[in-house]
Swiss-Prot record:
It comes from Oryza sativa subsp. indica (Rice). This is Alpha-amylase isozyme 2A. PANTHER family: ALPHA-AMYLASE (PTHR43447). InterPro entries: A-amylase_bs_C, A-amylase_pln, Alpha_amylase, Glyco_hydro_13_cat_dom, Glyco_hydro_b, Glycoside_hydrolase_SF. The record marks 314 as: Transition state stabilizer. GO terms for molecular function: alpha-amylase activity; calcium ion binding. Important for breakdown of endosperm starch during germination. The keyword Iron does not apply. Its EC number is 3.2.1.1. It is an enzyme of class 3 (hydrolase).
Amino acid sequence: MATGRRLSMILLLLLLGLASGDKILFQGFNWESWRQSGGWYNLLMGKVDDIVAAGVTHVWLPPPSHSVSTQGYMPGRLYDLDASRYGTSMELKSLISALHGKGIQAIADVVINHRCADYKDSRGIYCIFEGGTPDGRLDWGPHMICRDDTQFSDGTGNLDTGADFAAAPDIDHLNGVVQRELTDWLLWLKSDEVGFDAWRLDFARGYSPEVAKVYIEGTTPVGLAVAELWDSMAYGGDGKPEYNQDAHRQALVDWVDRVGGTASAGMVFDFTTKGIMNTAVEGELWRLIDQQGKAPGVIGWWPAKAVTFVDNHDTGSTQQMWPFPSDKVMQGYAYILTHPGNPCIFYDHFFDWGLKEQIAALVAVRQRNGVTATSSLKIMLHDADAYVAEIDGKVVMKIGSRYDVSSLIPPGFHLAAHGNGYAVWEKSAAAAAAAADHRTSSSASL
């Protein structure tokens, strides 16, 4: 258990990190969290101190509303937070309040591409929506569905602006009532009545960036709005990703541009980096540099707008849609927690896999040395069995099976964190400060 003095110092670092623009995200759930006896919100409440002690600045929570699916990704009555399988509205508000008390922002998982209806119309089709309030907010009919979603619509709506979602009605986001009422709902989630600070946009491929911009700007100021834009990469005949994934990351960068660029809170999950890392750590670390000598994902082009991650509830957890090699997970964290971009830690790895101390140690190195989303990156080695990089001239990291890379470590650097297949060094001054902080904390606990 951290001492009161230690927690105060951590809170100060968190606030300084938020002020400087440095973000450490934490996905606070997995695909099976809804099964938790006693409620997931209550379980997570008991882990807030561990999360804050790891230097986290933002916690991503599951979809909060009533949903046909237990995980929350088939929402219906959006204002009904008491029908969530993760807990009650009061438990959610208490959790958010606890996070705020530690200087942590809460990210809502916003599922607005599609929506499930409560009632059938005269055709016998489920397309009459109930908002979850006594009044008419979000009480919609089939004319609020995209007309090319022929399974559900009555043919009067606008065409869909993005990819189809077959399992539920695709909402017509060009409809003025839809835009206004969804914006009002988001503002309610952001208000003191609930308390969310930021958005994760689920299945953002389902509607255009211009539509996303409406909701981002309509809820400004918002801490961040990170979009899930998961598209297939380019693959070769051997089934592995092509070396050049510029087209893949260009699509992500284009989305950021179209929602407002630098002036917008819009960000993207860096699926390009995720896909390249999945293969690179399996003895192909030469992939971690592009043709211009930069990182090959979105972090190589626009790191301030990239949220990097190792796995999430879809790619990992029990779904295993695109899992990171399980024996190399800490190599993934050594990469994202030392590199530019905005890293996101996954609940399973931190709590269930027993990696809490190793991950927290990497975050501490990052924050101690002032590494941020826009830090400079110098790639020193990119062989099949070893990747070495220097960040801001303050941190050097290595991943891969090769043990000895000592010839690349600059004078005055000392080992700060290490584990299976990874090592991180920092300059002596930072190492000395960390040791002094540890001695102070130890003395305070005596």
